Amino acid sequence: MCDEEVAALVVDNGSGMCKAGFAGDDAPRAVFPSIVGRPRHQGVMVGMGQKDSYVGDEAQSKRGILTLKYPIEHGIVTNWDDMEKIWHHTFYNELRVAPEEHPVLLTEAPLNPKANREKMTQIMFETFNTPAMYVAIQAVLSLYASGRTTGIVLDSGDGVSHTVPIYEGYALPHAILRLDLAGRDLTDYLMKILTERGYSFTTTAEREIVRDIKEKLCYVALDFEQEMATAASSSSLEKSYELPDGQVITIGNERFRCPEALFQPSFLGMEANGIHETTYNSIMKCDVDIRKDLYANTVLSGGTTMYPGIADRMQKEITALAPSTMKIKIIAPPERKYSVWIGGSILASLSTFQQMWISKQEYDESGPSIVHRKCF
């Protein structure tokens, strides 16, 4: 089998979900929760073949008897043993491939510590024996997926949000800003404000229900105060949702109060700037000559940018902050939930990229630090 036929594997490890598949595909084959669960109790049934750990959907469905851990916190891997289990599950159970036969493209959070990139590299070559690998910054891949090489990406997932200015394909590290406010915080906030309505959601299982309510019914208001007034005076904004047990709940202003926290983190008791100010501050940290290009190419990426109305609201807020003559364009691709993965799929299948891979041979000669020389 010649090299041309071996598809590279693309794995985008997010705080909440892991997206994996083959380079050249237009969507990931496998999308599963980034969780590892271990049994809380000793098994009583003899011969049940109890596993000592469960990953992804299986961990999710057995969560009643497991202790769940997320090895990726705020976009950064903090537990390598569990991370290894997630990668093992990705290759062998989800994609059903032998990692020693495929180059692997991994993604990393912006500002990922150097030691972390080295550790990822080491695990790929030493544990999984991959023939070649590469580590790419998530936001840069999202920008590629939108067909650009210059722009600013607001990437907001489950565990962390970043604003990443990119010029001619290179992220500008001095201007990257991180906001520890993302999907998980919004789910928690929605649990809290639904409790105020008299619906009690407390367990991890119930949190998943609230996440579903959030994904199906929430939206961003163009004018928050005006929307609050509308919600107070009529029931036109109310929607109902059927819980798994058949009970139907009604939600009104919670629909837009929940994602409003992205623009007003004070709702969550956080002293931080909203995503619009963070984006603006990120642009202002860049060279004055490239700001025009960033304002005109502001790309939204990640699951937490999927709320209806978010692009219009960003346009309005950034227009208010920017110089009055500035052309501002917010790009919100419909597939932005997976745009990091899609960008990776595009990158790994480019003919010009093939000399960029770190080969097993190069790794054996230089060790894990090779990653800083070849992936930047």
UniProtKB/Swiss-Prot annotation:
Brain of newly enclosed adults. SUPFAM superfamilies: Actin-like ATPase domain. The keyword Acetylation applies. InterPro entries: Actin (IPR004000), Actin/actin-like_CS (IPR020902), Actin_CS (IPR004001), ATPase_NBD (IPR043129). Keywords: Acetylation, ATP-binding, Cytoplasm, Cytoskeleton, Hydrolase, Nucleotide-binding, Oxidation. It is an enzyme of class 3 (hydrolase). PROSITE patterns: ACTINS_1 (PS00406), ACTINS_2 (PS00432), ACTINS_ACT_LIKE (PS01132). Transmembrane segments: none annotated. Its main location: cytoplasm. Its EC number is 3.6.4.-. It catalyses: ATP + H2O = ADP + phosphate + H(+). The modification N-acetylaspartate is found at residue 3. Residues 1-2 form a propeptide. Actins are highly conserved proteins that are involved in various types of cell motility and are ubiquitously expressed in all eukaryotic cells. Multiple isoforms are involved in various cellular functions such as cytoskeleton structure, cell mobility, chromosome movement and muscle contraction. This is Actin, cytoplasmic A3a. It comes from Helicoverpa armigera (Cotton bollworm). The lineage of its organism: Eukaryota, Metazoa, Ecdysozoa, Arthropoda, Hexapoda. The gene is actA3a.
